């Protein structure tokens, strides 16, 4: 073969490789709950010819695992998801592009946290912030709380007590209260109203600069990004913690915005103690990176592969902006104000986060006492616990969870080898005998209770002895039937499903089809089907999280807060159920791992009068317990 022919062949192979790359179908992983949205978006006429396909993951954590296992190519992810990717063993993730906003499409970061002081201020270093009057966006928020606490702690300027008698939250509040003379730090310090009230009463100087110190919550004209600046400009503050974009808006440094203050009277305070004018580049001490797309090395190795995937994503993204189904697009992080931005090179998640100084913010310990050990028994429980641990830590839920696997978890908690265990109804008594106590329970939602449906014509005498129709495979329905039998003086151990449908045990969620019937209450009186809340026979105990009775009050409060936080973030009603599926099916063909699939949240007390340990124990006819592996 001549050199000329070799060159022709090489050129032809190059063209074929390019065509093959162009024709490759890329697999975008999306959480299961948004899978239909992804399919609908790809059906949109605007997406015609875009070679993308949707792959369903249980949640974002599962999608990351699928990318690592080469079962998917790309995922739209937030910085916290990138943190999970960075800490995944044997992984080679790459951040390849960003989702920016129209207003800040040229900005390297989504936002920059800064320190703002008055030009005539005597504060010229981080140390000199001690004793100052501080203005914050709000409790628990990034630039106004987490970043200042993290940075000042890391600089060994803010001293946080490790007093075991204080909760992690109170330790930080106490530290800020002692560091600043007065502040405006609005927000909910605790999910429990009484605890929130007591904390604000104990540290009143944290609310002293607010518009309404006695309320110390939203709305307040000195809260939020612009409110923190206003607290410094119009209030009594001496330093504000906010972000650059709102500095520009507040001082009228963006077109079409009326200034609220004079920018020449204020300066940025830098970490090294220097100052910068507001009309120049800011010196931020931490930034939040952009949301973006994450892939793996195989999909983006070499410029050609990288650019091809980026080009395909850009077309998908641009078309998504013009899609008819805007809601479906938004679930895939394609919002009307968004702009797609390709990275010049694929970047490791660790490098991406460290460049912004955001890794430290995620890793802030929250002044937690220690890691809390959750005991599990089976391999699949261990897998779910570890997934929960990864998701929780990345979303700054503290204390950190550590998963341990034991044959007998109740004994492990009793013997101090673990701190907590999820206990099903049939093992409450064993847990109580082991000196354990519940701190939270799973809840199935307000109308997910079992009721007895009857004909309105049936007399009380009829109802006293008629057999009960129910699903014998449904443990909750079985307990409701047993409870009704006990109320009627019938031996609960002889409860079996009947084919007769005079009395039917059904879930209140199905009552629409029984609206011509009535409910039979625990008093054996009848009520309309609309009265299911007070007239139900729910007697099964939900899964409870048990801890040692001997744990200190602070430890107990910390554990309770941990699970309430998990529920608030990842429960069915939570803010981020697509990040981690706390409740719901964890794996194909595997149900009720640690918690029930149909649970929706954790609650701290059982409010249904029928649902209590005494009633449940009175219905027992067997010795079913957790099997010891």
Curated annotation (Swiss-Prot):
Fe(3+) binds at residues 111, 225, 408, 561. Residues 26-366, 372-621 form the Transferrin-like domain. Keywords: Disulfide bond, Ion transport, Iron, Iron transport, Metal-binding, Repeat, Signal, Transport. Hydrogencarbonate binds at residues 137, 141, 143-144. Disulfide bonds join 29-63, 38-54, 135-231, 184-210, 207-216, 270-283, 375-409, 385-403. It comes from the Eukaryota. InterPro entries: Transferrin, Transferrin-like_dom, Transferrin_Fe_BS. Residues 1-21 form the signal peptide. GO terms for molecular function: metal ion binding. One of its GO terms (cellular component) is extracellular space. SUPFAM superfamilies: Periplasmic binding protein-like II. CDD domains: PBP2_transferrin. One of its GO terms (biological process) is iron ion transport. The keyword Repeat applies. Monomer. Transferrins are iron binding transport proteins which bind Fe(3+) ion in association with the binding of an anion, usually bicarbonate. This transferrin binds only one Fe(3+) ion per protein molecule. Transports iron ions from the hemolymph into the eggs during the vitellogenic stage (oogenesis). Belongs to the transferrin family. This is Transferrin. It comes from Sarcophaga peregrina (Flesh fly).
